Amino acid sequence: MKSVLVIGAGLAGAVIAWECAEAGLHVTVVEKQDRVGGNCHDYDNEYGEKISSDGPHLFHADENSFSVEWLSQFTNWVKYEHRVRAILSDGRTTPLPVNRTTLEDVFDVDLGTPGETRIFLSSIQDQSIETPKNSDEVFLKSVGEELADIFFRPYTLKHWGKPATEIEAAVGARIPVRTNRDDRYFTDNFQYLPEHGFTPIFEKVFSHPRINLVLNTEYDHKAAQFFDQVFLTGPIDAHYGYRFGRLPYRSVKFIEEEIDYTPSATTMNFTDDGEYTRF
């Protein structure tokens, strides 16, 4: 029987390990942490609340996609549509991504239709930019100077550790601008969360009889000689000892506090230049 080594017990590692095991291969999964799930790992706290160890992870996709079909082998689903609001300087909150309501809140205008919204957007957008060279130019081209200052420039600096002018355009281009009042963060037709969280999915995957899971173990390059195939799913720069330099991952510090407050959306963004990014 052919043998496969998978480095990392996160989402990519789980898919590779399961598919190889289902194909009749013997699979060993090596994970340096003491838990499965990678960044999707979650757990229940003392109050029965689901806590995401490395920040919330949401699932949104086309309902006919392979990812929905594959994950549905291991979980039932609970409907969840994510919403984000930004805290303005006067304490009010407004939807993100920018939509018609956001424009009305910031500029104190009344935009009755998508057509009126498009006309208003064109009046504040930087029309001189044809092909944005960085994320800052993406923001200027899509929402103009004032909204770039309010929502994106300070937040990007906190989030990435460098200004939007130094971040490639593809990053900023991920953020949509809407002419309707849809305040959902995503528009996919399948927006759900696993009924019991993400961790039970991984536990089911790695319980496959042809998968051997080894936790608390760093990958040793010498081990590759004992396997027919090796799959790396962790940070590739770390795998090569950073000898080609470090890749620019964004960094977020998570602080857990209990406060008596009910937010108006699941995620509240601090888009100013203060210490925090969101809660």
Model-derived regions: residue spans:
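N-terminal Rossmann-like FAD-binding beta1-loop-alpha1 element of flavoenzymes
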Residues: 2-29
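Glycine-rich FAD pyrophosphate-binding loop
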Residues: 21-46
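Mid-domain catalytic core of redox enzymes
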Residues: 23, 217-279
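Short aromatic-enriched loop/helix-cap "lid" or pocket-rim segments at secondary-structure transitions
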Residues: 40-43, 98-99, 227, 244-245
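Short glycine/proline- and charge-enriched loop/turn segments
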Residues: 44-53, 182-186
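Dinucleotide-binding Rossmann-like beta1-alpha1 core, especially the glycine-rich loop
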Residues: 47-126
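Active-site/ligand-binding neighborhood in enzyme catalytic cores
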Residues: 92-229, 233-240
